[in-house]
UniProtKB/Swiss-Prot annotation:
UniProt keyword annotation of Nucleotide-binding present: yes
Organism field: Naumovozyma castellii
PROSITE patterns: DILUTE, MYOSIN_MOTOR, SH3_LIKE
Domain (Dilute) ranges: 1143-1357
Gene that encodes the chain: MYO2B
UniProt name for this protein: Myosin-2B
UniProt GO BP: actin filament organization; endoplasmic reticulum inheritance; intracellular mRNA localization; mating type switching; protein transport
Length: 1419
């Protein structure tokens, strides 16, 4: 080993396991190395040793040498096998660093290490994450449990080989949750596969199967999981779930195998632990009536439930869990009636625990009237008398007789508990069998082609007191570890052979002696079974046999006897030595009930319980038959012990695993407090040793633990080759495999002294431990040397440029000084001349102002005198007129009184006469139309009467035309006598025609009066305005102001009504004027009766076949010809009152434009959409349901934006799109504000799109990504600045700040805080996502760990408080036409466009019959 000053290393520590240190001193004196290590906390550790190549404490004064540490670039690697120094602290530190970065998964070769976060991380298992890992190789994505599941699924499909995923770890490490997510992945990936193929029938079938498979989890957890001190949901059994596939790789079913249910938990629970979940769910979820039927109360009232203390779990609602369990039981085929029977059995077990057995001097007694006994027997359907008898007695069968004896108190308790355990274990096995019958029917069994097994099994257990359960669990882990070691060893050797390198046999510690100790013919299990079959067998005698058999060579290497006590034995497992307490081994191994008790249970009247016992008996017969087939002895009819059953099931499991392709997941529990994101070094270290990860690493270290591909090695270490060889790498020249091998060999042969430290294979280079760290060190030295050389040349060039710039500045400064002096001299002469001129002008101006001031004073005096004289004259005149007016009033008072009296009488008489006339007229008016009344009261009445009269007149005209036509035809085809007979009809026609003429004269008279009324209103308005201007008295003007405003509003209303009446008059006059030739009638008929043809011509021909005007035309009418034609026709329809038809035309036009732009070519879409966005804006001036038109315009605008978004693939395509929009916006007479709004919308989309790409699509980021994206942003901003787009930088601020974040250097938290002030728009969650993906380049240092930890804590707080989204919205929902044209007034539609001229411009090669006919009528 090399311990030069500056070497980073690890030193053992009792609190943290290992601490990071750096060598600060290394002196060699008197044959001893004096080394000083400085830890990260500043602690100095002195070490004295005589050998640097030994870690033997005996040779180094009981001091261990430190372990070398990996370079920073390798410390947080996602695969532990890539570490240069593959040792215990390096592995621990790598897992911890990834855990602190919220990466809970790490690869260790073929093993996935999963560290429990104790936090909700649902985003890691979302459907998006499943899709991301589907159909991807494991090396393409970050470590994840889905990568292992995908690898198993693809290998099963591609290689047609069964797969097994082994999920192991200690209680609370997350095994059960990991197994759940694996099952969810298989169901989701398989369903996605058939969704794409469109197999709807299969989707329905698979959804039912998937629901049943997933429903097994709540059932198995309720009956097999319990709360322990380490885990609130600890699995107390092993489970091997097989997901079955047919030949088409469809999921067709599932099968479950269970191992070693912890039966003793039913009758005993340690402090702070609980019994199985189902009991507490039953007590919380059952109704009150059902509880009364089952005699259930609270958990504290039952002995089997109150031993552990607390009966609840924080954060868990047992009533909700009960509902989930009930639903799952129904899903897997257990109906409500059977569920009720199951709850009866469970309630009976609780009552059995409360049976009170009384103790006497030598034996035990149990009354058949015990309340708990009566309740239990009632629920189980048993006889209380016989049941109580065989709880306290036993029967021994001899050849000649049967001997019945009493049991002691302790034996009676054991008998009672054995019955309860037997019933519960039988119920559990029956549930598993029932589930297998539902999920794996005979039809499914015939179509099974392959399967993927998920083994969720207990990890290595080592407590203060270890009993039979821990012995079986550790025995299973020994078998699995042996298989795992052989598997890893096999893979290592296969890769060496495949790469054709020189290698020697890898030695590793085999645990076969420990397995032989347990399972040999004279092993621990065999002796245990032998002792269990003896009537007088005991734990003490069995322990004595163990000591006599194994406490001697060669078995004493793995078996030991404790120094004190005779009730323990020690086994040296692969992980750690475990001391087992022998108390209870014999009883737990038997774990059965007497024949008498079994006969009592078989006599049950409970049908479900009878079925359970039948199933259990059938299973026992199967086990006995299998045992008889392998061992032909007279004892084959004996009941199998629990140990033999477990051994046989374990052998079957290993055979199954060995026949499949195995994948490994090791779950790690980071702390005992279950605190989120807390990492306990010592606890994790012990689990790494227990789960075999470190043993695997030792196997890898024995060979070549590090391996690099040729291309990766060249890209990283080409700097170590001579400089003349760099060109082939830096110029990106393609190198053949032979060239790459030669290049790698050139570097290695020059830098590494021994070829034993590396081997060059066919595709990779294999390195011994520590070689990569050495190469990294000399590469770092080389980079430093080259950096110094580059700095030297750059500084020389820099200072030379400063010198040349200084000389140039001096010369420029001299020239500027001379120029300034010359300008100052000329400026002085010019100022002198200007001063002389100013003095002259000032003197003349002062004299002129004095003359003007004198004249002004004279005029003011004259004005004041004249004002006084005029005022006096006006006062005298006012007094004179006032006196005359008073005299006139007095003289006129008497005649006026007489006149008023006469006028009052006259008015009274007139009122009475008018009243009589009005009453008569009222009777007549009631018969007429109601519009006559409104005609007297308002101008609106005149309008209605006029419209009615016009309609009647038009109908009369049509009738007269018809009669005229009839008359002319009769005149042509009828003889003179007949004509003579029609004279009366002719006379009637002439009379009617004369009446029409009179009506026309009447209408013209009414219109003339209406025009006179308008003129009077206008004159009144002018007189009032002149009156307002002519009044000089301020008080009088203010008093008239309010009256003037009211009069103005009335006149304004009259103007509006006058305009409307004028339009109606004009329309009516034209109809009356041209009524004889029926021109307007024909136009109305076209616009009403032929609407469909007109809409078809306008929409389907003119607009959809119209081409965008080519550049070069300048007239507005040519640009916007289609929309002008549409506006003209709509105005024409409004003129005739056909607004409903005009609505249909507008809606159909916009909807067809939306359909066309959706299917249009991308190149034409930009100009076409831009043209119609501007054109459709002109329609907003029409009074045609503006809300509906705006909605259609918004839809058209958003559709056009989506088409533009699809074209923005690269920065060049973005600039081309911007140029096109800019050019055609101005070409179509759009404003610069409109162009700015459109570009702003596109910039917002670019900001969201580029920012989201950095967050999601990029797996890794570096400063080059930021530099490239920054250059693209600069191109876009340069374009915006050149086209005067305001605030363009603000719309790209998110992606711009993200690029700066990737480019800025962060060396400590202070730097990071400065970066946060610059990146103020980025949340902590977004910065954490970016920096987590950041990977330093070869010249960079990685981001410090304390910065990442600080950012992680900030992001977690922000996620829980602010609820901010990680990504930006890149959709079109926020864009609208109202925002696009905000601040731009709507251009009024030009009603003076010559519609006939527009219609005549139609293409001559097209046939538009309705439009051309309309044009001919309007010509």
């Amino acid at each position: 080993m090399s311990f030069e000053v500056g070497t980073r290393c690890w030193y053992p520590n009792s609190e943290a396991g290992w601490i990071g240190c750096e060598v600060t001193k290394n002196d060699f004196q008197d044959g001893t190395y004096h080394i000083e290590l400085t830890s990260e906390t500043g602690l100095v550790i002195p070490i004295e040793t005589k050998h640097l190549e030994s870690n033997n404490a005996m040779e180094n004064n009981h001091e261990f040498l430190p372990v070398l540490r990996n370079p920073p670039i390798l410390e947080a690697t996602h695969d532990l096998t890539t570490l240069s120094y593959l040792n215990e602290p390096a592995v621990l530190h790598a897992i911890k660093e990834r855990y602190n970065q919220r990466n809970i998964y790490t690869y260790s070769g073929i093993v996935l290490i999963a560290t429990n976060p104790f936090d909700k991380v649902e985003e890691l298992y979302s459907s998006e994450m499943i899709q991301a890992y589907a159909r991807k190789n494991r090396d393409e994505m970050a470590p994840h449990i889905f990568a292992i599941a995908e690898e198993a699924y693809r290998e099963m499909i591609n290689n047609d080989q069964n797969q097994t995923i082994i999920v192991s770890g200690e209680s609370g490490a997350g095994k059960t949750v990991s197994a759940k997510y694996i099952m969810r992945f298989f169901a989701s990936v398989e369903e996605e596969h058939f969704n794409k193929e469109g197999d709807s029938k299969h989707q329905e079938e698979m959804s039912d199967i998937e629901v049943k498979i997933l429903a097994t989890n709540p059932v198995m957890e309720a009956f097999g999981n319990a709360k322990t001190t380490r885990n609130d949901n600890s699995s107390r059994f092993g489970k091997y779930l097989q997901i079955l596939f047919d030949s088409n790789k469809n999921i067709i079913g599932s099968s479950i195998k269970t191992y070693l249910l912890e039966r003793s938990r039913l009758v005993f629970q340690p402090t702070s632990e609980r019994n199985y979940h189902i009991f507490y769910q039953m007590l919380s979820g059952l109704s009150s009536d059902m509880k009364k039927q089952l005699y259930l109360t609270n958990a504290e009232d039952f002995f089997y439930l109150n031993q552990g203390g607390e009966s609840t779990i924080n954060g868990i609602d047992d009533s909700l869990e009960y509902s989930t369990t009930i639903e799952s039981l129904s899903t897997v085929g257990i109906d409500t009636e059977v569920q009720l029977q199951i709850f009866k059995i469970l309630a009976a077990l609780l009552h059995i625990g409360n049976i009170e057995i009384k103790k006497t001097r030598t034996d035990a007694t149990l009354s058949s009237t015990d309340p708990s006994l009566q309740k239990a027997c009632e629920l189980l359907g048993l006889d209380p008398l016989t049941f109580s008898k065989w709880i306290t007695k036993k029967q021994i069968n001899t050849r000649s007789e049967k001997i019945i004896s009493n049991l002691s108190f302790n034996q009676a308790l054991v008998a009672r508990d054995s019955v309860a355990k037997f019933i519960y274990s039988s119920l559990f096995d029956w549930l598993v069998g029932n589930i297998n019958n539902v999920l794996c029917t005979s039809q499914v069994s015939e179509t099974i082609n392959s399967f993927i097994g998920v083994l969720d099994i207990y990890g290595f257990e080592h407590f203060e007191q270890n009993s039979f359960e821990q012995f079986c669990i550790n025995y299973a882990n020994e078998k699995l570890q042996q298989e795992f070691n052989h598997h890893v060893f096999k893979l290592e050797q296969e890769e060496y052979v495949k790469e054709e390198i020189e290698w020697s046999f890898i030695e590793f510690s085999d645990n076969q002696p420990c397995i032989d100790l347990i399972e040999n013919k004279l092993g621990i299990l065999s002796l245990l079974d032998e002792e269990s079959r003896l009537p007088a067998g005991s734990d003490e005698s069995w322990t004595t046999k163990l000591y006599q058999t194994f406490n001697k060579p060669p078995s004493n290497t793995v078996f030991g006897k404790p120094r004190f006590g005779q009730n323990k034995f020690i086994i040296s497992h692969y992980a750690v030595d475990v001391t087992y307490e022998v108390d209870g081994f014999i009883e737990k191994n038997k774990d059965t009930i007497s024949e008498s008790q079994l006969e009592v249970l078989k006599a049950t009247t409970n049908p479900t319980l009878a079925t359970i016992f039948e199933f259990s008996e059938a299973e026992n017969k199967t086990n006995i038959t299998e045992q008889a087939g392998t061992i032909q002895r007279k004892t084959i009819n004996r009941k199998p012990t629990l140990g033999s059953i477990f051994k046989r099931s374990l052998v079957e499991l290993m055979e199954t695993i060995n026949s499949t392709n195995v994948h490994y997941i090791r779950c790690i529990k980071p702390n005992t407090e279950k605190e989120a994101w807390k990492f306990d070094n010592l606890m994790v270290l012990s689990q790494l040793r227990a789960c075999g990860v470190l043993e695997t690493i030792k196997i890898s270290c024995a060979g070549f633990p590090s391996r690099w591909a040729f291309e990766e090695f060249i890209q990283r270490y080409y700097l170590l080759a001579p400089t003349d060889q760099w060109g082939r790498v830096t110029a990106d020249m393609e190198m053949s495999l032979e060239d790459m091998v030669a290049f790698c060999d050139l570097i290695l042969s020059e830098k590494i002294d021994s070829k034993d430290k590396y081997q060059i294979g066919k595709t990779k280079i294999f390195f011994k431990a520590g070689v990569l760290a050495y190469l990294e060190k000399i590469r770092s030295d080389k980079v430093t040397e080259l950096a110094v050389l580059i700095q030297k040349h750059i500084r020389a060039k820099y200072y030379r440029s400063l010198y040349l710039q200084a000389m140039l500045s001096i010369k420029n400064c001299q020239s500027l000084i001379r120029g300034v002096q010359s300008r100052q001299r000329v400026d002085f002469e010019m100022k002198t001349d200007a001063a002389t001129l100013l003095q002259t002008l000032h003197r003349s101006t002062r004299v002129r102002s004095q003359v003007f001031e004198t004249l002004k004073n004279i005029l003011e005096v004259q004005t004041a005198i004249r004002r006084v004289l005029v005022s006096n004259f006006i006062q005298r005149e006012f007094e004179s007129r006032s006196a005359i007016m008073i005299q006139s009033k007095i003289r006129a008072n008497s005649p006026k009184h007489r006149y008023q009296t006469l006028k009052t009488g006259t008015i009274l008489i007139q009122a009475l006469v008018r009243r009589k006339q009005s009453q008569e007229k009222l009777k007549q008016l009631k018969i007429q139309a109601e519009s006559a009344a409104s005609l007297k009261n308002s101008a609106a009445g005149i309008q209605k009467e006029l419209i009615g009269f016009i309609e009647e007149l038009i109908s009369n005209i049509k009738e007269n035309d018809a009669k005229t036509t009839e008359y002319k035809s009769l005149l042509k085809h009828t003889s003179l006598p007949v004509v003579t007979g029609t004279n009366e009809r002719t006379a009637a026609y002439i009379s009617t025609k004369n009446q029409v003429e009179e009506d026309k004269v009447t209408i013209r008279t009414i219109l003339t009066k209406y025009e006179t009324l308008k003129d009077l209103c206008r004159k009144e308005l002018k007189s009032l305005e002149s009156l307002e201007k002519g009044v000089n008295d301020e008080k009088f003007a203010s008093s008239l102001q309010s009256s003037l405003e009211l009069i103005k509003r009335d006149i304004s209303d009259l103007r509006i009504n006058a305009i409307e009446k004028d339009n109606e008059r004009t329309s009516t006059s034209s109809e009356l004027k041209d009524g004889t030739d029926c021109t307007d009638n024909a136009v109305v008929q076209i616009l009403t009766k032929r609407q469909g043809d007109l809409i078809n011509d306008l929409v389907n021909v003119v607009f959809l076949e119209f081409q965008i005007p080519q550049r070069g035309r300048t007239k507005d009418c040519e640009h916007f010809y289609p929309v002008k034609l549409l506006i003209s026709i709509v105005n024409l329809m409004n003129k005739f009152g056909l607004r409903k038809s005009s609505h249909s035309i507008l809606k159909q036009t916009v909807q067809d434009l939306i359909g066309k732009i959706s299917s249009m070519d991308a190149k034409k879409c930009v100009t076409f959409g831009l043209y119609w966005i501007i054109s459709l804006h002109k329609l907003s001036s029409l009074p045609q349901e503006p809300a509906v038109l705006n909605k259609l315009q918004d839809k058209f605008y958003k559709t056009w934006l989506k088409q533009c978004f699809n074209q923005m693939k690269t920065v060049d395509s973005i600039l081309i799109l911007f140029d096109t929009i800019s050019e055609f916006t101005l070409f179509f007479q759009g404003t610069t504000e409109l162009l700015t709004n459109i570009i702003t919308a596109l910039l917002q989309h670019i900001n969201a799109k580029w920012f989201n790409d950095l967050l999601i699509k990029q797996n890794t980021l570096s400063w080059t990504h930021g530099l490239e994206k920054d250059s693209e942003i600069k191109k876009v901003l340069d374009w915006c600045n050149s086209h005067k787009i305001r605030n363009s930088t603000e719309y790209l601020r998110n992606v711009n700040q993200a690029c700066k974040l990737l480019q800025l250097r962060i060396s400590n938290i202070s730097d990071f805080q400065l970066v946060c002030e610059f990146c103020y728009d980025l949340s902590s969650l977004q910065m954490h996502a970016l920096l987590t993906k950041y990977r330093p380049t070869q010249f960079e240092k990685p981001i410090p760990v304390d910065v990442l930890n600080h950012l992680s804590n900030t992001a977690r707080r922000e996620r829980t408080t602010m609820k901010r989204e990680l990504t930006l919205d890149a959709g079109t929902e926020t864009y609208s036409v109202e925002n696009l044209f905000q601040g731009h007034p709507i251009e009024a539609s030009d009603e003076h466009d010559d519609i006939n001229q527009l219609i005549n411009q139609l293409p001559s090669d097209k046939d538009f019959p309705v439009i051309k006919e309309l044009g001919s009528l309007l010509a």
